[in-house]
Regions:
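Conserved donor NDP-sugar-binding/catalytic core segment of glycosyltransferases
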Residues: 1-25
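A short coil-to-beta-strand element that immediately follows conserved catalytic motifs
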Residues: 9-11, 88-90, 124-128
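Conserved nucleotide-sugar donor-binding catalytic segment
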Residues: 13, 19, 26-107, 111
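Basic side chains
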Residues: 55-56, 112, 135, 140
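Membrane-proximal basic amphipathic "stem/tether" segments
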Residues: 117-146
């Protein structure tokens, strides 16, 4: 009998940041974790949706109520529905340095906060945002990047 090979429900990898001309500016500050679960996204958008591939069977439609963070919500939903998740450890996408949520940072953060409250609860979301602020300013002051 032939064994049926089952593919992972989600495949993910790394993201390279590029400028408007497509020149590499380096790797994304947040590295994709070795193991990824829906709970991993408590720490923010750890994997760009451009470097996140989901089987259609588990992928919901984007929630268009979220203008800037529908991708974040979508990734969490895919991960909650997945049984097998695979890290390729490869660069799967190039990401333009100034994307839509980068330009609209304040509105994007507000929407992300709403999504996080929905999945992780209000108290843990407030505490995590304190950590995000520390992480952001550490990267800005000591590493010269955001």
């Amino acid at each position: 009998l032939k064994k049926k090979v089952s593919l992972p429900d989600v495949i993910y990898g790394e993201t390279r940041i590029v400028d408007a001309e497509g020149r590499s500016l380096g790797m994304r500050r947040l590295k994709a974790p070795e193991k990824l679960t829906w709970k991993s996204f408590r720490m923010g958008m750890l994997v760009c949706h451009q470097s996140f591939i989901s089987k259609r069977e588990i992928a919901p439609l984007y929630n268009t109520e979220y203008r800037l963070t529908a991708d974040y919500d979508w990734c969490i939903q895919c991960l909650r529905r997945s049984k097998r998740i695979h890290n390729t450890r490869l660069i799967l996408s190039n990401f333009l340095e100034e994307g839509l949520s980068s330009v609209n940072r304040k509105a994007s953060l507000k929407e992300r906060y709403e999504v996080m409250c929905k999945y992780y609860g209000k108290v843990s979301t407030i505490l995590l945002h304190g950590w995000f602020a520390v992480r952001f300013y550490f990267a800005k002051w000591f590493k010269g990047r955001v």
